[in-house]
C-alpha cells in the first residue's frame, strides 16, 4: 500500500507553535508516531478484513488469533481466554462468546497500566463485501473501523513504539481485547472488572468524535426491564369472563411504573416495546413488555431495581402470573478526581506539545462502555476515548476514522503510558 509523502509530526508541530511558550513535543516519540502511521493503517486493513460480529464465533476466532499473534511478536505473554463460563446471562446472551486476548508486558517499575478495546462489531456475515477497507482522502473506511478496530490498532502500535524506545519503566502493561462488547460484554465483564481493580490506571480506546475531540470520564449506565404476564385464553365474545386477560395486567403494570424516572438524578425509565395476543376475538393468554433504563450512578441501579420489584407485586388481576426480569447491561462510568487529574494531564500534552485542543467530558452522555466495568471496583483513574477520531459507528456504509488523527493519538497514548509509569499524571 502506498501513502502520500509524510512530514514528521515534530516538524509540523514546531512550525505551528513557533513563537509561543508551549513545550516542544518529544522528538523521539513524534518521529516514531510518524513512522508507525503506515504500519497502523496496514493493521487496520488486516483487522477490518476479518468479519467479527459478536455472534460470529469463527470470525472472532480468526481475529483473536491475529491480535494474539501481534502481541506475541511484540514480546508479550499472551493468553486466549474463553469468558463463557462466568457470563452474566441476559435474554439475548449467546451460549458461547468470543475469546478475550490478554497480553502482559513486564517492566522494571511499579505502576500497573491497563489498555482496553474490543474486537467484535454489530455487523452480520457478508456485509464486509459492501464496505471493504479503503482510504479516501483523510478518511479510512471499513466495517467496525471506528468501533472499535482502530482501538486495537492504536494499542498495538503504542506498544510497538514503547518497545522500540526500550521503555519498561512500568511494572506491568496489560492489554485486554474482548469479543462481546456489542452485546453488553456478558462474558468479559467480570474479567474486565477484576483487571481494573488490579491496575493503577485504565485507558480505554473507543474512538473520539470528529467534530468534538474529547475524552470521556463519564457515561450513562444501561439496564433493561422485561415483563412477562401469563393469563388464560378464552373467547372474547362468548366467554370473556372465563379468561384471564394478560393484556389488562400488563397495561396495569406499565402504567403503575410510568413515574419512576427521576430528572433530579438523571435516572430514566421508559417502556418502549410490548406484545400481546394473536387474534382479535381471543382473550390474550400472554403479554410482554420491555423498558429501557438509564442511570448516571451505580447506586441508582439498586434503587430502580428495588422500586420495580416492589411495584410489580401490586397486581390488577390476582389470577395472572407476572414475572419481571431486571438486567444490568452496563454500569455507568462515574467521573472521579483521579480521572479528572489524568485527563487534565492528557489535555496539557495535547495543547502544549501538539498544539491541538482536547476536551474532557465529566458529564455522562451517550452509550455505555467497557471502561465502566473496569471502574466498578477501583479508585484508580479510568478514562475512555483515547482512540482515533471517527464517525459512523454501527453504520453499514459510512463508518470511518480520520487518518490525520493517527499520529497525535499515538503520541498521546505513548506519552500517557510513560508518564503514568513515572507517576507524573496524579495531581
Annotated model-derived regions:
Residues 1-10:
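Bacterial N-terminal signal peptides that target proteins for export
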Residues 18-21:
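N-terminal signal peptide c-region/cleavage motif recognized by signal peptidases
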Residues 24-28, 52, 69-77, 207-212, ...:
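Metal-dependent amide/peptide-bond hydrolase catalytic core
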Residues 24-143, 164, 169:
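Acidic/His- and Gly-rich active-site-bordering loop/insert found
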Residues 120-136, 199, 203, 216-228:
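Acidic-glycine-rich active-site phosphate/pyrophosphate-binding loop
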Residues 123, 129-133, 139-173, 376, ...:
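A structural preference for long, well-packed, hydrophobic secondary-structure segments
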Residues 137-147, 358-361, 396-397:
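Short pre-catalytic strand/loop immediately N-terminal to key active-site residues, enriched for Gly-Thr
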Residues 144-220, 262, 421, 425-427:
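Acidic/histidine-rich catalytic neighborhood of metal-dependent amide-processing enzymes
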Amino acid at each position: 500500500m502506498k501513502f502520500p509523502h509524510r512530514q514528521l509530526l515534530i516538524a509540523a508541530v514546531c512550525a505551528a507553535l513557533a513563537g509561543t511558550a508551549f513545550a516542544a513535543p518529544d522528538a523521539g516519540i513524534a518521529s516514531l508516531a510518524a513512522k508507525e502511521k503506515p504500519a497502523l493503517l496496514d493493521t487496520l486493513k488486516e483487522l477490518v478484513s476479518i468479519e467479527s460480529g459478536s455472534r460470529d464465533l469463527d470470525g472472532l476466532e480468526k481475529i483473536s488469533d491475529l491480535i494474539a499473534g501481534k502481541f506475541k511478536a511484540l514480546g508479550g505473554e499472551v493468553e486466549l481466554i474463553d469468558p463463557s463460563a462466568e457470563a452474566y446471562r441476559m435474554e439475548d446472551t449467546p451460549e458461547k462468546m468470543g475469546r478475550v486476548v490478554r497480553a502482559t508486558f513486564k517492566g522494571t517499575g511499579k505502576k500497573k497500566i491497563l489498555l482496553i478495546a474490543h474486537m467484535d462489531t454489530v455487523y452480520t456475515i457478508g456485509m464486509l463485501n459492501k464496505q471493504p477497507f479503503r482510504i479516501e482522502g483523510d478518511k479510512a473506511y471499513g466495517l467496525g473501523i471506528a468501533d472499535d478496530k482502530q482501538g486495537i490498532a492504536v494499542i498495538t502500535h503504542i506498544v510497538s513504539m514503547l518497545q522500540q524506545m526500550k521503555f519498561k519503566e512500568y511494572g506491568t502493561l496489560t492489554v485486554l481485547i474482548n469479543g462481546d462488547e456489542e452485546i453488553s460484554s456478558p462474558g468479559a465483564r467480570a474479567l474486565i472488572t477484576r483487571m481494573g481493580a488490579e491496575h493503577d490506571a485504565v485507558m480505554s480506546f473507543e474512538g473520539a468524535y470528529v467534530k468534538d475531540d474529547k475524552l470521556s470520564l463519564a457515561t450513562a449506565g444501561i439496564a433493561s426491564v422485561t415483563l412477562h404476564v401469563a393469563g388464560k385464553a378464552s373467547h372474547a365474545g362468548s366467554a370473556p369472563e372465563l379468561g384471564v386477560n394478560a393484556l389488562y395486567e400488563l397495561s396495569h403494570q406499565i402504567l403503575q411504573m410510568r413515574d419512576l424516572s427521576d430528572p433530579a438524578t438523571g435516572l430514566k425509565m421508559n417502556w418502549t416495546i410490548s406484545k400481546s395476543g394473536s387474534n382479535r376475538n381471543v382473550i390474550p393468554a400472554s403479554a410482554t413488555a420491555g423498558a429501557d433504563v438509564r442511570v448516571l450512578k451505580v447506586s441508582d441501579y439498586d434503587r430502580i431495581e428495588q422500586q420495580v420489584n416492589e411495584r410489580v407485586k401490586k397486581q390488577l388481576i390476582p389470577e395472572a402470573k407476572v414475572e419481571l426480569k431486571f438486567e444490568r447491561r452496563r454500569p455507568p462510568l462515574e467521573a472521579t478526581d483521579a480521572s479528572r487529574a489524568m485527563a487534565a494531564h492528557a489535555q496539557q500534552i495535547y495543547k502544549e506539545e501538539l498544539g491541538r485542543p482536547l476536551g474532557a467530558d465529566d458529564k455522562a452522555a451517550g452509550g455505555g462502555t467497557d471502561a465502566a466495568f473496569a471502574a466498578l471496583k477501583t479508585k484508580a483513574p479510568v478514562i475512555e476515548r483515547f482512540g482515533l477520531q471517527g464517525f459512523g459507528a454501527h453504520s453499514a456504509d459510512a463508518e470511518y476514522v480520520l487518518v490525520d488523527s493517527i499520529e497525535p493519538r499515538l503520541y498521546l497514548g505513548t506519552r500517557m503510558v510513560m508518564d503514568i509509569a513515572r507517576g507524573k499524571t496524579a495531581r
